[in-house]
Amino acid sequence: MKTLTVHTPSHSYPIFIGNGLLPQAGSLLKPHLGKRAAIITNETVAPLYLGTLQTALDAAGVSHFSIILPDGEAHKNWQTLNLIFDGLMQNRAERKTTLIALGGGVIGDMTGFAAATYQRGAPFVQIPTTLLSQVDSSVGGKTAINHPLGKNMIGAFYQPQAVLADLDTLHTLPARELSAGMAEVIKYGTLGDISFFEWLEQHMPELMALERAPLIQAVYRCCQMKADIVAQDETEQGIRAWLNLGHTFGHAIETEMGYGTWLHGEAVAAGCVLAARLSEQLGKISAADTARLAALLEAAGLPSAPPVFAFEKWLEHMSHDKKVSGGIMRFIGLNRLGEANITEITDTDILRRTLQPYL
């Protein structure tokens, strides 16, 4: 097991990364739990891992109840959030009841937002069961639900008490979901660590085969990078925006196609290539750099091109992006592979040129 600590102005918390951790969840997490816990999970994860977690909590003397939600990005909304609140109130959850998110990014985001708002703030912990959530969404305190006009538009910054990432849960992950998570792994190398990017180029087959040693190394490096960035910029006033590489274009894809049609990681993959193409247009990187990024994404089973839709739709969706400031769109671009930047775009013609092959 590897452990690292996330330090933020609000508080610090541990991330536990390894294999076979879920049966130890009671003992590992007990210092970070109240006397009672609410497990929030979904219909897919519950049959696989809920029983193991319940047994672990019983052994640690933590009482608990469970709330099982429908699965999928299409359910990341007010209606499903209210199911969490209904379950908490029906079970007389108190402010010190710890919410436990057992699932992927959707469960983690919604559980965190429920925790941030239930009785004005209850503690929560993350037990991410997908690669995407283990390397990205479970760490850093971003919580949200979607709105029909934009992804993650309603939410809060609210840090968990702990994160427990059991890599064994990835063995039940569908291949498409594994690839989607790998998009976020590749994103980290692309935005801030060229040596990690090169390591991914060398080890992608082993990672996709879930070989234990390279997998734990990759997950640890991603969490380490995110922890370092979040420590500097908890509420995304500056450098943390780099973690949104590919997300401005990616969220536009998800919104246009309907939440869940393209998985988040698939949209981010295509979005990263578009961000690279935009950086090409600005003279920052070469076409060869963009091709190299696209090749790595494709090696992970990911799309390197977006779906085709009208330029006006792209602009409409991207105008709702959370990085927009003073009406000016801001994109995360690249100075080079391994180094991101924040780019303000006032001339939409450059966006049209970037997107032209896909209009």
Curated annotation (Swiss-Prot):
Gene Ontology MF annotations: 3-dehydroquinate synthase activity; metal ion binding; nucleotide binding
Compartment(s) of residence: Cytoplasm
Essential cofactor(s): NAD(+); Co(2+); Zn(2+)
SUPFAM superfamilies: Dehydroquinate synthase-like
Binding residues for NAD(+): 71-76, 105-109, 129-130, 142, 151, 169-172
Protein name as it appears in the record: 3-dehydroquinate synthase
Keyword terms: Amino-acid biosynthesis, Aromatic amino acid biosynthesis, Cobalt, Cytoplasm, Lyase, Metal-binding, NAD, Nucleotide-binding, Zinc
